């Protein structure tokens, strides 16, 4: 391990998997002597871990690089600053990033950040440049190991990467590659190490997490690859882990084993994120979603039959090419039927290289904005109604940190709602029962019932 003290600043854009990747980058760089800096001004190495899902994602990165340029020039006389671009913009743009922004020293894709020590050394040699955007997912997790630096009581754990669905609006198959799953033993080793460090809740991550198809535990090879339902049950056996979540799923990969896991695995939280994107079968077909609106609703019905207290969240896109008023009304109808607890909604934006970007019947931006406003009003009302339905209920809350007010605690309900309650600091890291007394669109508040339980 290096004894030279260096400072690292990582700016993370986008999804939970990027948050996980940023944490693992810190793990990789700690043996080199890097410690976290609060701002770029205090850093020797700045990494922009980027997302390419939304419109103008790359331009946002170039704007940030423009802001970093004078800072790098200023530091040139006092040891210098290394700037790296990582993540999905790095994968999509590659060497073009260094052409457009010479301030960048290295570019590393989401499957090769385990090579950061070598790439940094390469970039430092004679002030050169370093680039690696190969797809080497298996090698990455072998190199990363299971030891992680963690804070708090919840952690993300990537179990699956990539996507083979090729939705016509999405860049993920091009930036994250084909679907690949980690072996069960490797995942379990990482989660056991997290539990030993005080983690009480894990969220299993994947671009298509319910497509998980990992090698079974040692000695059980005859069983063949395990699905996500089997993995969830296995993780539930790990001492110290009280709560399990997973995201993000695709309707095509839902199976009865996973649905049944909601019924028979109490540690699996009753909150499920299942994107649908549209309620019109015509638009779903054009998106290449490979399911109909009725098939989506049928999955929700099966989930609610298995776990009556389950809440559903989703994703919606308005203004996809060819969307008519009737298509949009079908989306509103689906939303009314499902009654989402929460739902992310966006205007369609062209992603370069995707089939959707080349479609001729693009929807006017004004129409998109108007439809989004209507949809978001409906979704906001549903979220408020869901939160208000908690009033009078007693919920188990994982207390994560002190609240903003003195003597207050902040925690999360099984449904990922923020919960504020007055209570002693020693409850942090434990699950306590809270009677909900008030609700807003974004949080709940209540009082402790006196019941609490330490982690298993």
UniProtKB/Swiss-Prot annotation:
| Binding residue positions for [4Fe-4S] cluster 1 | 15, 51, 88
Q: Which reaction does it catalyse?
A: N(6)-dimethylallyladenosine(37) in tRNA + (sulfur carrier)-SH + AH2 + 2 S-adenosyl-L-methionine = 2-methylsulfanyl-N(6)-dimethylallyladenosine(37) in tRNA + (sulfur carrier)-H + 5'-deoxyadenosine + L-methionine + A + S-adenosyl-L-homocysteine + 2 H(+)
TRAM domain: which residues? 388-450
Query: What Gene Ontology terms describe where this protein resides (cellular component)?
Result: cytosol
Cellular location(s)? Cytoplasm
Q: Which GO terms describe its molecular function?
A: 4 iron, 4 sulfur cluster binding; metal ion binding; N6-isopentenyladenosine methylthiotransferase activity
Q: Which coarse location class applies to the principal site listed for this UniProt protein?
A: cytoplasm
What residue stretches are annotated with the MTTase N-terminal domain?
6-125
Enzyme Commission number: 2.8.4.3
Q: Where is the Radical SAM core domain?
A: 149-385
Name the chain's protein.
Answer: tRNA-2-methylthio-N(6)-dimethylallyladenosine synthase
């Amino acid at each position: 391990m290096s004894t030279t003290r260096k400072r690292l600043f990582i700016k993370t854009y986008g999804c939970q998997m990027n948050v996980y990747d940023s944490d693992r980058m810190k793990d990789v760089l700690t043996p080199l002597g890097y410690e976290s800096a609060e701002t770029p001004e205090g850093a020797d190495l700045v990494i922009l871990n980027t997302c390419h899902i939304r419109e103008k994602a790359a331009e946002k990165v170039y704007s940030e690089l423009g802001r970093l340029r004078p800072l790098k020039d200023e530091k040139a006389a006092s040891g210098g600053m290394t700037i790296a671009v990582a993540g999905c913009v790095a994968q999509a743009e590659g060497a073009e990033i260094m052409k457009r922004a010479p301030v960048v020293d290295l570019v590393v894709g989401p499957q090769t950040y385990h090579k950061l020590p070598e790439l940094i050394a390469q970039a430092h040699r004679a002030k050169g440049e370093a680039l690696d955007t190969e797809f080497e997912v298996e090698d990455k997790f072998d190199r990363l190991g299971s030891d992680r630096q963690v804070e708090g009581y919840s952690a993300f754990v990537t179990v699956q990467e990539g996507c083979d669905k090729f939705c016509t609006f999405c860049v993920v198959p091009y930036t994250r590659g084909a679907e690949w799953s980690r072996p069960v033993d490797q995942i379990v080793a990482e989660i056991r190490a997290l539990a030993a460090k005080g983690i009480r809740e894990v969220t299993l991550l994947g671009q298509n997490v319910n497509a998980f198809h990992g090698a079974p535990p040692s000695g059980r090879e005859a069983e063949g690859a395990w699905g996500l339902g089997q993995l969830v049950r296995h993780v539930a056996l790990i001492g110290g882990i009280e709560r399990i979540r997973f995201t993000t799923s695709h309707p095509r990969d839902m199976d009865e084993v996973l649905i049944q896991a909601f019924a028979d695995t109490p540690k699996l939280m009753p909150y499920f994120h299942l994107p649908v994107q549209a309620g019109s079968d015509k638009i779903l077909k054009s998106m290449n979603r490979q399911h109909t609106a009725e098939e989506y609703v049928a999955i929700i019905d099966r989930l609610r039959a298995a776990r009556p207290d389950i809440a559903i969240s989703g994703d919606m896109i308005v203004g996809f090419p060819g969307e008519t008023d009737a298509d949009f009304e079908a989306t509103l109808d689906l939303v009314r039927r499902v009654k989402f607890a929460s739902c992310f909604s966006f205007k369609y934006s062209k992603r370069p290289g995707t089939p959707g970007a080349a479609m001729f019947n693009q929807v006017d931006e004004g129409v998109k904005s108007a439809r989004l406003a209507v949809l978001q009003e409906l979704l906001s009302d549903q979220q408020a109604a869901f939160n208000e339905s908690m009033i009078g209920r007693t919920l188990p809350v994982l207390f994560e940190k002190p609240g903003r007010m003195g003597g207050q605690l902040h925690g999360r309900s099984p449904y990922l709602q923020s919960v504020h309650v007055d209570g002693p600091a020693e409850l942090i890291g434990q699950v306590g029962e809270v009677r909900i007394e008030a609700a807003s669109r974004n949080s709940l508040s209540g009082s402790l019932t006196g019941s609490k339980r330490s982690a298993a």
